[in-house]
Structure formats: structure tokens, C-alpha cells
Amino acid sequence: MSRALMIQGTGSNVGKSMLAAGLCRIARNRGLSVAPFKPQNMSNNAAVTADGGEIGRAQALQAMACGLEPHTDMNPVLLKPETETGSQVVVQGKRFTTVRARDYAKLKPQLMQAVLDSFKRLKAAHDLVIVEGAGSPAEVNLRNGDIANMGFAQASGTPVVLCGDIDRGGVIAQIVGTQAVMSAEDVALVRGFMINKFRGDPSLFDDGYKLIEQHTGWQGFGVIPWFADAGNLPAEDALDITTRTRDTGLHIVCLRLSRIANFDDMDPLAQEPGVRLTMLNAGEAIPGDADMVIIPGSKSTRGDLAYLRAQGWDLDLRAHLRRGGHVLGICGGYQMLGGSVADPEGVEGPAGTDEGLGLLDVETVMTGDKRLTRVAAIHAPSGTAFNGYEIHIGRTSGPDAARPFAVVNGQPEGAISGDGRVSGSYLHGMFRDDAFRAAWLAQFGVAQSVSYDATVQATLDALAAHLEGVMDIDALLDVRL
């Protein structure tokens, strides 16, 4: 009989996504047909699915841990922030609407039905579904109409295990306090807890572990030491991508935009021993020794173009090019490189046109139709075949597009400047392709030496072994109401 287990956390960034991925790999290793599920995710880091939709990147990684292709049912509601108070709402892989935060609650009854429909399909197709919550069930002010945590657990009859993060301190209060503010009906669904991100000797927490068991009456499933190889997995949050402080190597600088999207494009480059990656924060100047500057994707191209200028990066980019450096724009970054970005219909925000950086002779017009597709492409300069995906609104054209970055289905894609030092492309995921990454790095005299997908698979296996060694996995996988 098919079962489900939900991992909820005492807060954001306690490690729910990684733990869910590890449990998915463990279940698969034990011969179970297992699938991941997250009712509601908030992220601008999306993956394109085989069925032509988009889901959170964390669920795509969890699908990989299960040996499955990502599917839109694995993350039926995806919120993609566009402003401080508004998000695009993606339902079962397709853009549904854009809504202000205070109006989102009105949509929840309709969204809950979509969530339950997707969950039922997954559960019917698999032995086990590992469900990941969002944020924390302790945010009881949001409990009414909740579809992400206890609201979903109640509606679906799914047992819950609570995860606390000891690295940030106060884990006893995290778990005991969460129970204290929850309703009796919700507490009844919780079957236990686990402690994540422990550094040092776990036996030093034995007394604290027992205190949590005594105060809550919940079963403890284990204390999980810090997993040192977590950085080898695709980043879920832009802040998870850190500067790799190698002393030598090709120095690549990525601008950390305010609405940065699909930032896991940087992960494969960060793994390369011959690359020194700097994630540039607000207020920091582009270093004088940078070889390549990457302007990544953005959920708000015109907004981030203004943000880029506010940091002085537009002037830095011109100085970087005068020093002989190179620039690559990906998706929204590509749009920024042109002469203008026009949004006559107000698709991304207020209607209007903004001047671009003028580093490529192209122009972009935003359109209401969104392109979501996986592609097989050929890198025009090297002739290398590779795989990637498109996830964007807007169309870009102009004289520099006559020198394409790639060829997709026989059609030119992207643009390269006359001197060859500024490039732009809509294609995400290209650096994940080992053949493309090797060809691209070879332009700068760097040898590619990492098989990225193999590294991720090996890290998922190591994560599974890490959890198996410290948790009562048999009891955890047997949890039921």
C-alpha cells in the first residue's frame, strides 16, 4: 500500500530539501518506487520538466535521487517573486497569475485542490512519496488556509517528522516551541523529530536530545552531523552559491542580482579546479583581475538592470572590457546586454522601455507568451553539441544576432559581439553539460576535469550513506498515522 512521509522544519534553511533528497535516495536504494513532492515552493530557481512545465530546482534534484525525470506534479505550486510584495504563481508547471502577497490567501482553496490532485497521482504511482514542507508550521498566523505544511498534512492524512537546525543555536527551543504553538490537531500528526547540522561530537547533545523527547513526547530519529559535501549539490538558494577562493585559475565573476534566477547555472563552474568563481555582492566592484563576468538570469530584467546600475557595475563592465575581459549574459542577463528592453504590455512590471547596457547590438521586447522547453543545441564557435533549456519571456533580435552563440533546431540563438568578447544566450543549463563546459573553458586555456552529473550522483549516494549511519531509518520509513 502506498505511503507518504512529510518532512517539516522549525524554520527556513534547516536542511529540509537535502534531507528529503537523501531519504529519496535511501528509499530507492532499498528497492522502493519513491517520488518527491513539495506542495508549495517559493523560488526563482526553476527546472524545466519533460512535460513542458517548471518546478522548483530542489524537487528536480530530489527526482534525480529517486531515479525519476522531474514532473510538474512534484511541485504543483511554485511562487516566483517578482517584487518585494508580489509573485508569479505557477500551477502544475504553467503560469497561472501574478498576485500581491496580501491577496494570495484568496487563491489558496483553488490551489489546494491542484496540490491534492498532484499528490494523489504521485501516490498512486509509487510505493512512497517523500513530502517536503515550506518554512515552518510554527508560523501559526499563516495556518488558516495553509497548503504548504500542516494544512496539507491534514488534508492528505500524511504523518510529519519535524527537523531542527542545531547549527543556528537554540534547537531545543525550536522544536519544543514549535509544538507549543501548534494546535492539538496538528500536533497529533507529528510522529517525531530529527536534529540536523551538528558539528563536533554528537554524544555531547545526548542530554538535550532526551529533553526534547521528554518535553514533546515525540520520538527522536537521530542527530545528523554536518554534511561536508553539501556544496557539491545544486544550490537551492542564491546565497548557497559561495565564492570559491582558489588562488589561481580562470577568474569568473557572477553578478548577484537582486532577482537572480536559475543561479544553479554557476554550480558546475564552481566545481572546476581550474576556475575561481566570485559571487559579487551589492556594493562590491568588479575585480580588476576578472577574466569573465557573467550576468545571470533574472526574474525582473528591467528591475535588475536598474539594480546593476545602482551598484556601478555598468561602468565596471566597460572598464573590464577595456582591460581585455569577456562578458556572458544568460537569459535576463542577455537581455540587459542589448540596446534596450521594452515591455509595452507591462508583462514584468510597469509598461515602458529601459536603455540597456549597449554591449551587444540587439534589442529585446517582452511578450506575454513564456517559452519553456528543453533544447538540444550546437555551440556555434566550437561546434560542440550540448543540452540546455529555455525559460523566459521576451524575444531578442538585432545585428549581433547574425553571429549566434548557438544553433537550436537549425535556427540561430543568442548573439556575439564583433570582437567576440561579449556573448549572450537564452540557454540555461549549458554548463551542466560536460562537453559544452569543456569547449567553453578551452577558449580560455582551462581544461575541464569534472563530470558534473556524476559528481551529483556520487554526492547523493554519500548523503544517503551519511544518513543511514546516524538515523533510525527503518523506524523513519515505517512512520504512519
Swiss-Prot record:
Gene3D superfamilies: 3.40.50.880, P-loop containing nucleotide triphosphate hydrolases (3.40.50.300). Pathway: Cofactor biosynthesis; adenosylcobalamin biosynthesis. The active site is at C331 (nucleophile), H428. SUPFAM superfamilies: Class I glutamine amidotransferase-like, P-loop containing nucleoside triphosphate hydrolases. InterPro entries: Class_I_gatase-like (IPR029062), CobQ/CobB/MinD/ParA_Nub-bd_dom (IPR002586), CobQ_GATase1 (IPR033949), CobQ_N (IPR047045), CobQ_synth (IPR004459), GATase_3 (IPR011698), P-loop_NTPase (IPR027417). GO terms for biological process: cobalamin biosynthetic process. Residues 249-436 form the GATase cobBQ-type domain. One of its GO terms (molecular function) is catalytic activity. Keywords: Cobalamin biosynthesis, Glutamine amidotransferase. It holds the Pfam family GATase_3. Belongs to the CobB/CobQ family. CobQ subfamily. Catalyzes amidations at positions B, D, E, and G on adenosylcobyrinic A,C-diamide. NH(2) groups are provided by glutamine, and one molecule of ATP is hydrogenolyzed for each amidation. This is Cobyric acid synthase. It comes from Jannaschia sp. (strain CCS1). The gene is cobQ.
